[in-house]
């Protein structure tokens, strides 16, 4: 890495610690929610151009018909654009994006990036709720700004708990993952816990810099309170059902218990995936 590249990287990391993360996200959130015709049209067009958004696969292909940038960003896709793998026991990608990492959780530590890991107990936010996953399996899917930003069920399960965990709002791209210790266990997140045929399953929606909100189909849009919020539920969702959505991008982490499933060998760090694509398989007979 050249001196200039290293300097840019170091400045990028340092800047994230210096900026008022939550205040910035609130300001961005206000703009994203605006239904002012001029504001939302300008923001949508600029975003669409910068990231090359393909609206031909969206349920609403006309950018001008979205009420706000948030509605545009969390747009639904046309029916049939994403096909959920229907094989018995298959585990599917919860979102469009890139696999940041996947594999085995060793002694309660989840691999984040070269030289970095984080505690599954800190990620989940509760020692008892984290216990089933300490030697289990994980996959981390990063949703870039250009991706479809709804998160779906990787496997059929009954939602038993949601735990909102306040935290920081670092960017979650590869540069940050390689340089911020315990990144995903430090950022604001919503932990969703399920009972499944494979035992316990977790889907963790991790917030990031300028993310204007996290929403689930059960809790609605999460309103940051600055404190842990544990809620109990009894809602069954099928594989491929929508679970939640991000307002301005981030990361979804899925966790399974030990010896309950295996990942398909074709997938590795930086593999591109789409929602519904098979990622792994149950080891249950």
Swiss-Prot record:
Keywords: Cell membrane, Decarboxylase, Lipid biosynthesis, Lipid metabolism, Lyase, Membrane, Phospholipid biosynthesis, Phospholipid metabolism, Pyruvate, Zymogen. GO terms for biological process: phosphatidylethanolamine biosynthetic process. Its cofactor is pyruvate. Is synthesized initially as an inactive proenzyme. Formation of the active enzyme involves a self-maturation process in which the active site pyruvoyl group is generated from an internal serine residue via an autocatalytic post-translational modification. Two non-identical subunits are generated from the proenzyme in this reaction, and the pyruvate is formed at the N-terminus of the alpha chain, which is derived from the carboxyl end of the proenzyme. The record marks 249-250 as: Cleavage (non-hydrolytic). Binds 1 pyruvoyl group covalently per subunit. Pathway: Phospholipid metabolism; phosphatidylethanolamine biosynthesis; phosphatidylethanolamine from CDP-diacylglycerol: step 2/2. It is found in: Cell membrane. It is a peripheral membrane protein. Signal peptide: none annotated. Pfam families: PS_Dcarbxylase (PF02666). The active site is at 96 (charge relay system), 152 (charge relay system), 250 (charge relay system), 250 (schiff-base intermediate with substrate). GO terms for cellular component: plasma membrane. Disulfide bonds: none annotated. Its EC number is 4.1.1.65. Catalyzes the formation of phosphatidylethanolamine (PtdEtn) from phosphatidylserine (PtdSer). Heterodimer of a large membrane-associated beta subunit and a small pyruvoyl-containing alpha subunit. NCBIfam families: PS_decarb (TIGR00163). PANTHER family: PHOSPHATIDYLSERINE DECARBOXYLASE, PHOSPHATIDYLSERINE DECARBOXYLASE PROENZYME, MITOCHONDRIAL. This is Phosphatidylserine decarboxylase proenzyme.
